């Protein structure tokens, strides 16, 4: 059917309608009446995530995929625990119990569902999300330090001191991405490359810029060291060594007494098993498993929503994403 073939392309219903010589309303009606995409079976490795759907059934939709094949397995209208629990509980045990790995962010509802319904699986906390806990902690520290400097500068009677504090605050804002850069993922030449700093009227290497900024505040310097220590663990640790490595980091973070890192320590301790599992090497791919592939699928979902200028009808959105996002799907007429 032409409507289904055209709907597989990443285009709006308005564009699709012009090609077929029908109205947008007619094309949507024909599409909705012609398709009902079945869920794909659960596989050995599944990723679970959410994306902003803003349909009549809820703000966030739940997406389920297979990172090994790149297929979207299903999309649900809600990420609420009771909803996804009921959904998975209605899938036969034989199918659920053959799932070996489940990858997700550190959303407590997901952990509850995995523990109770996927009893043969290993739950993996996605690397990006657990690393982000520390980057967010350091970023809060950076912003708090920057605001502290600006407040002191505003009250200072010493013009030179005020000027210097504003300079540091400006550099913290301008070079925040550099401060968050993972030195264990960058080439050495990246940090040794010189940049011209207008505020200082001179050239500095990226490493010199970092040192100039963090040396202005003891907590900021310690926070930066903690951030890089965590990055090092994420790159060089292993399943066998992780517990020892992260416990050393806990001691380092606790001794720093930086408030912005306290919540991160608590989160890591609560999720230590799932975080450790992120270092497991999958036997078939010989790589660690992540939710990275879902980022591409989430971008696809956003693009389809944008092309449709938003979808209030969840089933319309789901069927369109499933049709565009999968190479092979089962369609119920």
Where do the model's predicted regions map?
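A structural signal for short, well-ordered beta-strand segments and their strand-loop junctions
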Residues: 16, 47, 103, 123-125
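RNase H-like nuclease fold core
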Residues: 26-101, 106-113
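Acidic/histidine-rich catalytic cores and adjacent linkers
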Residues: 31-32, 57, 77, 94-120, ...
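Short alpha-helix plus adjacent loop in nuclease-associated cores
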Residues: 130-151
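Residues at the C-termini of beta-strands that transition into short coil/loop
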Residues: 68, 127-128
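Short, basic interhelical loop/turn and adjoining N-cap
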Residues: 12-30
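Short secondary-structure boundary/capping segments
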Residues: 62-64, 116-122, 138-143
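Short, amphipathic alpha-helical "recognition" segments used to contact nucleic acids or chromatin
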Residues: 1-10
């Amino acid at each position: 059917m032409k409507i289904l073939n055209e709907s597989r392309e990443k285009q709006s219903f308005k564009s699709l309608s012009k090609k077929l010589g029908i109205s947008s309303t007619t094309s949507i009606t024909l599409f909705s009446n012609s398709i009902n995409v079945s869920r794909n079976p659960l596989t050995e490795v599944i990723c679970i995530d959410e994306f902003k759907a803003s349909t009549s059934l809820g703000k966030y939709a739940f997406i389920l995929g297979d990172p090994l094949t790149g297929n979207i397995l299903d999309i649900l209208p809600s990420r609420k625990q009771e909803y996804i629990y009921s959904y998975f509980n209605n899938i036969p045990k034989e199918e659920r119990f053959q799932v070996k790995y489940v990858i997700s962010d550190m959303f407590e509802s997901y952990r509850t569902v995995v523990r109770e319904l996927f009893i043969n699986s290993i739950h993996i906390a996605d690397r990006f999300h657990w690393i982000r806990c520390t980057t967010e902690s350091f970023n809060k520290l950076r912003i708090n330090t920057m605001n502290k400097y600006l407040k002191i500068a505003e009250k200072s009677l010493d013009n030179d001191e005020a000027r210097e504090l504003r300079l540091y605050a400006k550099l913290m804002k301008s070079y925040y991405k550099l401060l968050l850069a993972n030195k264990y993922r960058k080439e050495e030449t990246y940090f040794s490359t010189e940049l011209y700093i207008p505020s200082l009227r001179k050239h500095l290497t990226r490493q010199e810029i970092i040192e100039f900024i963090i040396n202005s505040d003891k907590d900021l310097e310690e926070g930066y060291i903690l951030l890089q220590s965590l990055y090092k663990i994420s790159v060089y640790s292993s399943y066998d060594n992780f517990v020892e490595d992260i416990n050393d980091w806990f001691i380092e973070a606790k001794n720093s007494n930086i408030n912005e890192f306290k919540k991160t320590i608590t989160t890591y301790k609560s999720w230590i098993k799932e975080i450790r599992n992120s270092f497991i090497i999958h036997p078939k791919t010989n790589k660690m498993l992540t939710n990275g592939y879902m980022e591409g699928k989430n971008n696809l979902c956003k693009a389809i929503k944008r092309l449709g200028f938003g979808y209030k009808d969840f089933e319309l959105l789901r069927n369109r994403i499933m049709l565009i996002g999968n190479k092979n799907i089962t369609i119920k007429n």
